Structures are given as C-alpha cells and as structure tokens.
Amino acid sequence: MNRILGWFAALVLAMFSATWAQGPETVVTDSLGRSVHIPVPVRRVVSLSASGVECIRIMERIDTLVGITEHTKTRKAQFPEVARLPSVGRGFMPNFEVIAELRPDVILAWKTNPGPELERQLEPLGIAVLRLDLTEPGKLPEEMRTLASILGPEAQKRTEAYWEWVARWTEQIQKSIAGQPKPTVLAEHFTPLRIAGPGSGLYDLTQMAGANNLADDIGIRSMQVDSEWVLERNPQCFVKSILLGKRNAEEDTRRTDECLRSVLERDNWQLLDAVKENRVYILDSDIASGPRYLVGLAELAAWLYPDASVPSGKRIHEEWANAAWMPMYKENDGGQD
C-alpha cells in the first residue's frame, strides 16, 4: 500500500512539475529516427547505460546526472564521480517510481531497450525519452553530437575536440596496417557461439581493423550458431568479447584466462586455424564499443597484424584517461579555460 501511495505521490509531483515547467525546447533525432522534444536547458539526466555516462563525462556534464543503473553503480573504479547517485534499477528493467521521484528532464536509453513501456510510463510525466545506443563505432560520432546538442555549447565543443583526437589516432592505426594481408576473422559476443554480424559494435571494429569478417553474409547484428558453422568457416583469427569492468587487475586476468580456456576446449576446435596458430583473442567489451572503442581498435589491429607497428592501445588508453583531447578543446575555444 505504501509503495502504491509513494508511486502516486511521485506521479502527481512529476505531472505538476511538468505542467509548470513548459518552456523552451529543442528537437533532436534519436537512433530510431524519431523527433524528440527536449526541454532546454537540460539540467537533470538519468542514464540507463554506462556508455551514456562515459559520453556525458567526456562532455564534462556529469553535473547533470541525477540517476544511474545498478550496473553502473557497481563499477566504482570506472565511475567514481557518480557512484553515490541513486540507482534506478536495471538498464533493461528500470524502476519507474524512482525515476519519477528524480524528476529528470531526459532519460537516456538504448535504441530498443527497455521497450515502449518506457515512453508510456514517463512521457506523461513530462520526461523526455532519448534513445541513443552510444555503442556502435560507426554511429557513435553522430549520436554523441546529438547528446551534446542538448547539454550545451561547451559540451558540443568538447565533443568535437574528442572526435578530432579519435580521428588522429585512427589515421595512425590505419596507416600502420596499410598493405598488410587481411586475415579472416569471426567475433563472438558474451554468449557462447553468438556471432557478431553487420551492425554490431564488435563486427564494426573488425571492419575498421581491415579484417575479412566471415560473418558478413548473415545480415543481422548477431546470430546464434553451432560449432560446425564456425568449423566450416575456419577463421584465421577468433575474437571473443568479455565483460570485465571491475577494474581489479588480478580478477580480470583470471576471468580472461578462464574465458580463453573455455574457447580452446570446445569440441573439435583444435581443428580451427585460429586455435592451431594461437590466434584466439579475448577483448574487454568496454573497449570494443562505446566511446573507448579506439583502444579496442588498436589492440585488435595489433593482434591481427603482428608484423605491423601499430600504435599502443595502452598509450591511447592513458591519453583517454587523462582527457588528452582537452588541449584541442581549449585551442578551438580560443584558449579560454
């Protein structure tokens, strides 16, 4: 009973706030191609994805975040600035009551998750639902620019500086592998034998690295296959994505080793060229997609082209951690702090 009353009170408060908060707004296009009306200036944001939080941090607008998911809260080492923010539950199944109580201007969600219930529950409260995946390397620049456009001119300038930095490193990586023989590759998501296809961040990464991805004909972002399917295609390299994220080096190493062993021990996989040549690689999903995909691109290129002088993924990650693009932002901003 108390829970129902609490939800009702939050609903009334949010609807009252929405009624009186009518003012300027901007219209942006989300990842579904929809026109979304956003009240401006945006002061309060709930993000249902960790990649959304990372993008907002790049823009230096962490001050706008008022709620995050339980998953993001568990990653305190990666997101210390937001660890104390309220949890709104799981990214795919958020707590609408908590969101209503937080009264955000905008909730940032994936393209298709959660489902339409998100709009049905929140839009009547005056909460805009902005669906931006912010994961796929090919779409990330446009999506980040959309997000920056609602967070203000400084966020937009920092976003442009960030992509200048990404472009410089991408050019160096691609120059380093130019002319190298292209290996064949298959990439697997978290679920065993769930193969990454066109449109997925992991597939995009292999394409950016210039590999010949043997799943280019499946026509969908991911497909469940069996071992026979992989054995028939017989890739020279096999990439397995894993979710680490705890930032405990010893634990991450243990889990990476376990993951590699589980792949190598699959029935008949000793027949694969990738296994014979010790070319099975485990890639942390945090650097395989989202705003840090550049690090994953460098790591993947180094694996696929061992004879090339590929820029160090570690160095790129260090620059990312130190916001190395900020001098470009200040330069573009006329040197102002």
Mark where each language-model region is.
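A short, structured surface patch at a secondary-structure boundary
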Residues: 44-102, 106-112
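Positively charged n-region of N-terminal signal peptides that target proteins for export
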Residues: 1-6
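Boundary at the C-terminal end of the N-terminal hydrophobic targeting segment
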Residues: 19-23
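Short helix-initiation/N-cap motifs at beta->coil->alpha
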Residues: 31-33, 86-97, 113, 218-227
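Extracytoplasmic substrate-binding proteins
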Residues: 25, 35, 106, 116-194, ...
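Short helices/loops that flank or line small-molecule/ion binding pockets
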Residues: 95-103, 125, 225-234
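His/Asp/Glu-enriched short active-site or ligand-binding loop at hydrolase and phosphoryl-transfer sites
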Residues: 196-222, 242, 281
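Bacterial N-terminal signal peptides
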Residues: 7-16
